[in-house]
């Protein structure tokens, strides 16, 4: 019984750590996450949406726009978190 309670508490604490639980799909559909001062290439929009959410949780701005294709050179790479 104690093991079940510990397991439930563990799962609850892991879930409470992040609100960014969107599924990341495995399809290859390159997109670029755009911010005024940086860009980030991602394998697909779901990946970039999750990175954007995690950035917001860490007090950084989320992506303004996601555009199809790879990012253009000229801006630095955005940090993941």
Curated annotation (Swiss-Prot):
Residues 1-16 form the signal peptide. Main cells of accessory gland and seminal fluid. Keywords: Behavior, Secreted, Signal. It is found in: Secreted. GO terms for biological process: sexual reproduction. Changing residue 49 to N: In strain: Canton-S, NFS 5.1, NFS 5.2, NFS 5.3, NFS 5.4, NFS 6.1, NFS 6.2, NFS 6.3, NFS 6.4, NFS 7.8, SFS 1.1, SFS 1.2, SFS 1.3, SFS 1.4, SFS 2.2, SFS 2.3, SFS 2.4, SFS 3.1, SFS 3.2, SFS 3.3, SFS 3.4, Zim63H-12C, Zim63H-16C, Zim63H-28C, Zim63H-34C, Zim63I-10C, Zim63I-18C, Zim63I-53C and Zim63I-7C. GO terms for cellular component: extracellular space. Responsible for physiological and behavioral changes in mated female flies. This is Accessory gland protein Acp63F.
């Amino acid at each position: 019984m104690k093991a079940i309670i510990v397991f439930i508490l563990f799962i609850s604490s892991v879930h409470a750590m992040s609100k960014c639980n969107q599924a990341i799909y495995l399809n290859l559909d390159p997109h670029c996450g755009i911010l005024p001062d940086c860009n980030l290439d991602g394998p697909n929009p779901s990946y970039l949406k999750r990175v954007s959410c995690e950035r917001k949780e860490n007090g950084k701005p989320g992506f303004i726009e996601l555009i199809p294709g790879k990012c253009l050179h000229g801006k630095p790479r955005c940090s993941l978190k």
